[in-house]
């Protein structure tokens, strides 16, 4: 009989490993909205909307953890961060501000919601037309706030 024992594996570096920067989710994502079937799109000029073509380069997003349950969402091609302004508009900022952080929550229907950390009752949302929905017009239970993260590997 072979002797049994415990095999120990090498520990990962404290920074989370060298494969990707700490805090970054490994692969870029597309955020598919349940309302109208649009992918969240961040344009280089700062506009935010939805588009149905998953091949559009501006739907490739990098989600980065700021702290537990809080993320920033960066357009890979646009090199801008999703932000919610004080009037509820969505736009893309060149640099990270307090308006760029969102509470990410997995809902019971397996869709994610992204609620503004600064304006805590407002959500990222897309209308059935593909336009963003003002944060002040959003709330729990709306299809417009439900997003399914999908892989955006090339």
Swiss-Prot record:
There is a cross-link at residue 94 (Glycyl lysine isopeptide (Lys-Gly) (interchain with G-Cter in SUMO1)). GO terms for molecular function: chemoattractant activity; chemokine binding; cytokine activity; fibroblast growth factor receptor binding; growth factor activity; heparin binding; histone H3K9me2/3 reader activity; identical protein binding. GO terms for biological process: angiogenesis; angiogenesis involved in coronary vascular morphogenesis; behavioral response to ethanol; branching involved in ureteric bud morphogenesis; canonical Wnt signaling pathway; cardiac muscle cell proliferation; cell migration involved in sprouting angiogenesis; cell population proliferation. The record marks 127-128, 133 as: Important for interaction with integrin. PROSITE patterns: HBGF_FGF. SMART domains: FGF. Phosphorylation at Tyr-81 regulates FGF2 unconventional secretion. Residues 1-9 form a propeptide. Gene3D superfamilies: 2.80.10.50. It is found in: Secreted; Nucleus. Residues 127-143 are annotated as: Heparin-binding. SUPFAM superfamilies: Cytokine. Heparin binds at residue 35. GO terms for cellular component: extracellular space; nucleus. The modification Phosphotyrosine is found at residue 81. CDD domains: beta-trefoil_FGF2. Signal peptide: none annotated. Keywords: Angiogenesis, Developmental protein, Differentiation, Growth factor, Heparin-binding, Isopeptide bond, Mitogen, Nucleus, Phosphoprotein, Secreted, Ubl conjugation. PANTHER family: FIBROBLAST GROWTH FACTOR. Belongs to the heparin-binding growth factors family. Monomer. Homodimer. Interacts with FGFR1, FGFR2, FGFR3 and FGFR4. Affinity between fibroblast growth factors (FGFs) and their receptors is increased by heparan sulfate glycosaminoglycans that function as coreceptors. Interacts with CSPG4, FGFBP1 and TEC. Found in a complex with FGFBP1, FGF1 and FGF2. Interacts with FGFBP3. Interacts with integrin ITGAV:ITGB3; the interaction is required for FGF2 signaling. Interacts with SNORC (via the extracellular domain). Interacts with glypican GPC3. Acts as a ligand for FGFR1, FGFR2, FGFR3 and FGFR4. Also acts as an integrin ligand which is required for FGF2 signaling. Binds to integrin ITGAV:ITGB3. Plays an important role in the regulation of cell survival, cell division, cell differentiation and cell migration. Functions as a potent mitogen in vitro. Can induce angiogenesis. Mediates phosphorylation of ERK1/2 and thereby promotes retinal lens fiber differentiation. This is Fibroblast growth factor 2.
């Amino acid at each position: 009989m072979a002797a049994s024992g415990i095999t120990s594996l090498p520990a990962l570096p404290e920074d989370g490993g060298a494969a990707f920067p700490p805090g970054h989710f490994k692969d870029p994502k597309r955020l598919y909205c349940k309302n109208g079937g649009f992918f969240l799109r961040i344009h280089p000029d700062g506009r935010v909307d939805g588009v149905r073509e998953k091949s559009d380069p501006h739907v490739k997003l990098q989600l980065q953890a700021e702290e537990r349950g809080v993320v920033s969402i960066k357009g890979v091609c646009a090199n801008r961060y999703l932000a919610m302004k004080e009037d509820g508009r969505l736009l893309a900022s060149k640099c990270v501000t307090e308006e760029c952080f969102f509470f990410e929550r997995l809902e019971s229907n397996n869709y994610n919601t992204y609620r503004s950390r600064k304006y805590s009752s407002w959500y990222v949302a897309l209308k059935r037309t593909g336009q963003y929905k003002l944060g002040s017009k959003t709330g729990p239970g709306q299809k417009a706030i439900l997003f399914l993260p999908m892989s955006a590997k090339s």
